């Protein structure tokens, strides 16, 4: 597939008196991603109450980039690792929760599950799409923070070993 060289940061070249502005080329798109995190929980139980406090945090870091490795009949200086785009992203996601179940009577119990979640998301750099109106690669500039509260409450009624009824109310966001 012929591509316009300007899309890849390459200048047109002249061969046999003719300017060549598009050509066959080979490109590589690569990612260098890292992910890590951790979780914890503390649990408590007595004869009527079961509770858990926990949470976690994780982080993703991504470097995305593209290289032009070969251009058909290209006369200009082409580095073996000519990069035509690069961007970096980072997403940090942390949460904490408290959940509990309390036995009200012989078969009726109440429960609550409360979660707070925070997300921090950034992207910076250029993507691989060329903007012909701006004569440049499209730039990415994202710096967003999100906070969510996800409550859940309800009742469980164990009628017998074969039948159970429950009612709950919850709000979920991601």
Model-derived segments and spans:
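Structural signature of Gram-negative outer-membrane beta-barrels, strongest in the C-terminal barrel
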Residues: 56-58, 82-174
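Short, small-residue-biased leader/transition segments that mark boundaries at the very start
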Residues: 1-2
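Small-side-chain secondary-structure face that scaffolds active or pore-lining regions
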Residues: 66-71, 88
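Flexible loop and strand-edge segments within Gram-negative outer membrane beta-barrel domains
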Residues: 27-34
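Flexible, solvent-exposed coil segments and beta strand-coil junctions
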Residues: 10-24, 70-81, 124-136
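A structural preference for short, pocket-lining loop segments at secondary-structure junctions
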Residues: 50-52
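Long amphipathic N-terminal alpha/beta scaffold segment
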Residues: 21, 37-39
